[in-house]
Amino acid sequence: MKIGFIGLGNMGAPMARNLIKAGHELLGFDVAPTNVGDITQDSIPKIAEECRIIISMLPDGNVLRNVYEELIPLCTPKTILVDCSTVDVESALHVSKEAEKNSIAVIDAPVSGGVVGAENGTLTFMVGGEKDAYDQIEPYFAIMGQKSVLCGGPGAGQSAKICNNMILGISMIGVCEAFNLAQKLNLNWNRLFDVVSTSSGSC
């Protein structure tokens, strides 16, 4: 089955390449096609015409809404759209509701792992959507990543990503505050690092 991939930037391009390496035929689209000349590219209408599974990796919710506004009316019913962008929950729910009107399933599946994870196929996918659609897409997640978790219905993937990022942010703030306190107490940072690395403060 030919897979569509919209958004071939720092994350999208290596994800698409891993699908190609696994033997899948892929048709891509990006606003800067010269950056990924090794991936066959065409237009959004062509992708909608030829692909029943279309993955996107876009920079923000506004871009997602604009792309899906063009894409959804062009897709055949039963097409599955898989958005791996990190966007706001409201945008994820909006495109899901619009797609549902056309009998098209949307899965929100933001990732964790960064560019290295995208290149190595070790991403974690936080997935929101219907289980039937997830079951069809899970084998592709397994190619692009090491783990995928169905977190709930539409929008649940983006909700999980926000919570994950909150934990990361709070942890970073805690580490910074601890080292700031160490400096005020004239405690050597390297010695504190050695202690924390093998103690309960390790995170």
Identify the role of each PLM range.
Residues 1-53, 57, 78-79, 115:
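NAD(P)+-binding Rossmann beta1-loop-alpha1 motif at the extreme N-terminus of oxidoreductases
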Residues 2-5, 81, 106-108, 126:
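Short glycine-aspartate micro-motif
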Residues 26, 40, 105-107, 148, ...:
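Hydrophobic beta-strand scaffold residues
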Residues 41-75, 79-90, 125-126:
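Rossmann-like NAD(P)-binding element
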Residues 156-203:
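Helical "substrate-binding/catalytic lid" subdomain
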